[in-house]
Amino acid sequence: MYGKIRISAEIEIKTGMHIGGSNAYSAIGAVDSPVIRDTLTKDPIIPGSSLKGKLRTLLARSISQSIILEKHNNDHDSIKRLFGSSGDKIGDKIIKSRLIFSDCPLKNKDKLKEVGSTEIKFENTIGRIDSVANPRQIERVIRGAIFDFKLVYDIDNKDELEADMKNFAHAIKLLQMDYLGGHGTRGYGKVDFSIIDIEVMENCINQDEKAKIIEILRDVG
């Protein structure tokens, strides 16, 4: 049995978020640490790779019996089948990720037009020994920005579907208690998820199974 589930959601930024982009060609006086942006629209985005990496790490930590995480190829099987495994050496089994992430574009650009979608936060570190100040400017996506989240789950084994959805939902809940992007321990990157739509393709599961999946995911937010 094979099919796909498409999950649509909104990610609302609750505190300024910084996911860094390139400043290789910044002019003199430019922001020290800009956010990553869509090349075409110039709007900030949340890269799918950032989401995938953060969710995998949080889920691995919640399952791991050790404080220090193993290499990702040594993750629990329930994590590897969701996020994939490339293998460390020739002959290792390669596991394709069942979760297919996409970059998340800014959704409420028009609402933010007057104030802008980002802000510049001025920070300063002071050396304990010499008391020398090191000022810096960090660009952040502002509180209230909403991003369009799309994810596809490949149904490779229907017997594992419910467990996979529970693990995915658990990872989302962990993220909402953690942070996305950098500088999270200083208050950056708090986010909320709101599931908008769950679409099952190919009619690969019945209505009762679909209702169960919806129940699991609706509990996220």
Task: Locate each region found by the language model.
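RNA-binding basic/glycine-rich loop and surface signature characteristic of RAMP-family CRISPR effectors
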Residues: 1-221
